[in-house]
């Protein structure tokens, strides 16, 4: 056979081998390829193909050059290893040709290049984009004077890059060892080939080290240079130190640890030089000097730090740490967005009257006597109707109802396919038939039926509304339980909702889904792992597959870099249903900011409001915080993903809420960081905690509550979220934190501080007074012994005018069977009074007296037909007005008596008691006249 024929034969072998490799590669990655195609179609259907392609383009821009360069470098490195091996053993005699060996080395170089490029492109693509597009925070840290964005977006990439380089170095060490082991096994040097200075012996590892000394030396130099870079970046970790009295760099960190890091940088650079020296001297033992010197610097630094902390800082801690406490205070408040809280004094008094109650009837009408937990139970028992329908959660929102601004409970009725009967668990039912949930349950928070259940404004099948809110598109194709893919526009009609003896059916009229025509039907059959899709006669060219319908999955697939709230809530707008979800930008790299979140995170912003159409599945991202540099960086990377909040339809914008998750974090931080004075903060002289309450029969921290409230100085009620504070070891109320939700005031935080010279009851004190009230406690015990359990609802703190009203509903549930909880009583507390009545109105009447209009009506009925009735009515009305004035005067005199008692002014105290006696006598005479 001629040389040309041999060459041709070898080429054919190479081509065949390459073809086999490509086939195996494609077959092995077929699933990934199909997922890539179908995911692209999914993004395209939503209008976010640019988001999908940004990731792909960036990975290719990183991966392809890195693959080419990496493969070449790996190949040259392997060739260098081979040559070095034969050079060391002074032999170039080989069993196979030099050319053949070089060809064989192409394959591992290709594999290593592919591994490295795919790993780096897959893990670093987003970090690189963040680094390249980072927007400034316009705030610098106090130690190194870097913009905060450097720590939030740039430093994480640099650290990740060093980790990647370190991993590649370890891979190079492994490659070197494995290569020389293989070479040693297939080409062990003969007696005449061994160099005299190698001292070749039976100790394989010593021999290996002698041969690979050059490569290990080169890798060692790079390693110590990388280590120096790691120590350089590690300096910035001092901003997150936990050594001092607060989070962040302390006195010891800035005066000792910082210099230890710098010494370790120098030691690492000297170690790199030492590796070169060890190689030149051919003495591997000299390599031990490098790690020993670095470790010694670290140990010495720790000893010095310990000494400085114990003998310089601790004896005079407040003076040494004062500047760092100030940094911690300032940067923690900035990181959690509590620096803009408006702090104001609450002009507290106990002079609330019946007239004030009537003037604030909008607030009274929105006091929540229903609790969302019992309401959820009720919805699932009386509005689910079928086992496969489920209300996952009850959300609190506000709507204009019949011209009034009302707070409501709202819950979507979703279809849970897992609850279909065993016989109904078929592919047709799960994919074509039972495709969507239906409608919502809507209730006012303050109204109950005669049986103590929530009044349902929106209910049943088909959806019925007793108010002026309508839902014309009640189907829910996208929700929290929609985990199964479905196919719409098929020959099989979809189940819509149950009727008495039949089922209503429908066909999908929306825009969601990828068409199942052409090759798509085969692609999605493969993706879903079923032949039924391919063989079903119900599927036509007009059919569409709808997958990834779960709203959480949907958001995470589009924008996984955003953290989403775990409590999506449903909104009605123009007859359609929409999901609204809060999105957060979170980081754990804000300098000096105390971590208060899971994962040691210490920065949070509610930067995104996500809206998902429950029928069509469209997903819209609206930027709600245009001052957050992280979301602005995301917007620079994905310009087609985000929209300004002004683009949100007004009907939806009216339902955005200040997120409870963010408010709870901020309220927890504010309990400590309301103290601005660093000395007060150091001594924790004014430390607060979120108030305690008794829920059910257990004591717990009060849950922040959405409610309607008329804030001091405002003319109308608004939707807010609030939480009360008490001193850390006391139970009297110290402050009330409120976040506004409506209109231009959205996002404003106000802290109302209670006067320190008055005892303002905290929720726990009210709970204790309820327990101490003989009448109430006896009734609670009686109900609890009669085969029922008593559930004490959330205690609500309701500001009205300059006073505080406390309201707590009581629920009764039979301990046997599947009985529903019902509102049994409402407890109301004001000042020193506590009453329990079947309704809120009756409880208020007991405290403040009945409405004048109601009394007039009763009197009019009693005197109807009497010729003097009008005169009698006028006299009684005048008497009621006089009694009201006397009650107000008695309250004022009583307050004066208490103030005199606190000041030890017993003369004024006695005068006040005498005046109080006169007022009470006049009141008694007036009431006797009314009774007659």
Swiss-Prot record:
Keywords: Cell membrane, Membrane, Transmembrane, Transmembrane helix. The chain crosses the membrane at residues 14-34, 60-80, 104-124, 166-186, 208-228, 256-276, 286-306. The lineage of its organism: Bacteria, Bacillati, Bacillota, Clostridia, Peptostreptococcales. It comes from the Bacteria. Disulfide bonds: none annotated. It comes from Alkaliphilus metalliredigens (strain QYMF). The keyword NADP does not apply. Belongs to the UPF0182 family. It is found in: Cell membrane. InterPro entries: UPF0182 (IPR005372). GO terms for cellular component: extracellular region; plasma membrane. Its main location: membrane. It is a multi-pass membrane protein. This is UPF0182 protein Amet_0022.
